[in-house]
Amino acid sequence: MSRHFRTHTTSRLTFPSSSGGLAITRLPFSSTSSKLLLQQLSSTSPAAAATAVTITTSSPARNLQRARASAAEQGMEEHGKAAVGWAARDDSGVLSPYNFSRRAQKDDDVTIKVLYCGICHTDLHIVKNDWGNAMYPVVPGHEIVGVVTGVGAGVTKFKAGDTVGVGYFVASCRGCECCGNGYENYCAKMVTTCNGVDHDHGGGAATQGGFSDAIVVNEHYVLRVPAGLPLDSAAPLLCAGVTVYSPMVIHGLNAPGKHVGVVGLGGLGHVAVKFAKAFGMRVTVISTSPGKRQEALEHLGADEFLVSRDAGQMAAAAATMDGILNTVSAWHPIAPLFSLMKPMAQMVFVGGPTRPLELPAYAIVPGGKGITGNCVGGIRDCQAMLDFAGEHGITAEVEVIKMDYVNTAMERLEKNDVRYRFVIDVAGSSLAGSGDAKI
């Protein structure tokens, strides 16, 4: 069994207007992380509203919504490719075998045999309808590594036999300012790899993810996986990798010799440490858990380890960091962390706590310090991240499972009982539901 890490959902911070002249600014993180917000931007358009399905309770309206979604899928299936995956059919989140059809391959499409697919915490939110936008039946999975089995007549980037990846989204408008600048991940018409609605390519059908044997994707959203990267532990890079790589590049936290703090040592945090060290940076892991010191320093190669609850350690590290990447998805006090940053430094949030965080204005105003967020990354950044990972041998820490184990894996993921990411050996699994559960 290969061992390796889990990602968390990412989130952007927003600042509501203050009232009464108070110096406290509330940063309202809700269960709708930035991934959900991006999904909602597309699903609430007039066209998307006609096919979007929000399922919370059993009712005639719910059955009608299901029927409409099913009809849209059947329209796609008439000339599509037969596929089998594991889908959730209600908010229990339980996954089971599901036969469906991929869309027919178009001139600019790539057909991919799925080899491995990572499990992200977002998948758990989707199958349990935590965000109220699940379109059942839903096949999760957006950390896909596979091999090209077919290409359309107009495809120029790939050929049969190429090893490729697919990340968090499979379509965008390609005409807006965000798309033009390489930030398709912030396009208002971005279509997620699973539980999205694809009007341009999929005929308005719900997208189904990588917990399946095959997928058909427009070549613009397909990524080349460098030779030499282990395919199982490369899969989480399609989400966790770009989620930390992209903001590090955008905010200049990739310069050799600079000092970056990484808050949290989980699925995102451990990958952030690996990328930062490969950039040549000085890396300090910041955690509430002293027991993670050995893991951070000896296994991952961090330069320093800081216990955030230790006032002495915090004081000694004051004003030393050029920036902080905050990967924590649970509530935590953030005001003390700003004391670690140099003037004008940025704290980038890539985790999405569900409880509101409080930030006193004095923590950022005197030093001109900034706070921002990041959600995955565009195609350009994702390909650059994979190429960089290939050059430096960066992978995620994973626990490889077979599809039969996926429901147990979801239960463990909900309890944070994984070190640090689950990856499904899709090609090595019996998708009909038999075979060994774990490898």
From Swiss-Prot:
Binding site for Zn(2+) 1: C120, H142, E143, C239
Pathway: Aromatic compound metabolism; phenylpropanoid biosynthesis
Cofactor: Zn(2+)
MF GO annotations: cinnamyl-alcohol dehydrogenase activity; coniferyl-alcohol dehydrogenase activity; zinc ion binding
Alphabetic keyword roster: Lignin biosynthesis, Metal-binding, NADP, Oxidoreductase, Zinc
Coiled coil: none
SMART domains the UniProt entry points to: PKS_ER
Disulphide bridges: none
A Pfam family the protein falls into: ADH_zinc_N
Classification via SUPFAM superfamilies: GroES-like (SSF50129), NAD(P)-binding Rossmann-fold domains (SSF51735)
Top-level class of the enzyme under EC nomenclature: oxidoreductase
InterPro entries per the UniProt record, alphabetical: ADH-like_C (IPR013149), ADH-like_N (IPR013154), ADH_Zn_CS (IPR002328), CAD-like (IPR047109), GroES-like_sf (IPR011032), NAD(P)-bd_dom_sf (IPR036291), PKS_ER (IPR020843)
Enzyme Commission no: 1.1.1.195
Domain of life assignment: Eukaryota
Gene Ontology biological process terms, A to Z: lignin biosynthetic process
Reaction(s) catalysed (UniProt annotation): (E)-cinnamyl alcohol + NADP(+) = (E)-cinnamaldehyde + NADPH + H(+); (E)-coniferol + NADP(+) = (E)-coniferaldehyde + NADPH + H(+); (E)-sinapyl alcohol + NADP(+) = (E)-sinapaldehyde + NADPH + H(+); (E)-4-coumaroyl alcohol + NADP(+) = (E)-4-coumaraldehyde + NADPH + H(+)
Binding positions for Zn(2+) 2 per the UniProt entry: C173, C176, C179, C187
Entry's family note: Belongs to the zinc-containing alcohol dehydrogenase family.
Protein purpose: Involved in lignin biosynthesis. Catalyzes the final step specific for the production of lignin monomers. Catalyzes the NADPH-dependent reduction of coniferaldehyde, 5-hydroxyconiferaldehyde, sinapaldehyde, 4-coumaraldehyde and caffeyl aldehyde to their respective alcohols.
Assembly information from the UniProt record: Homodimer.
Protein name: Probable cinnamyl alcohol dehydrogenase 8C
This protein's encoding gene: CAD8C
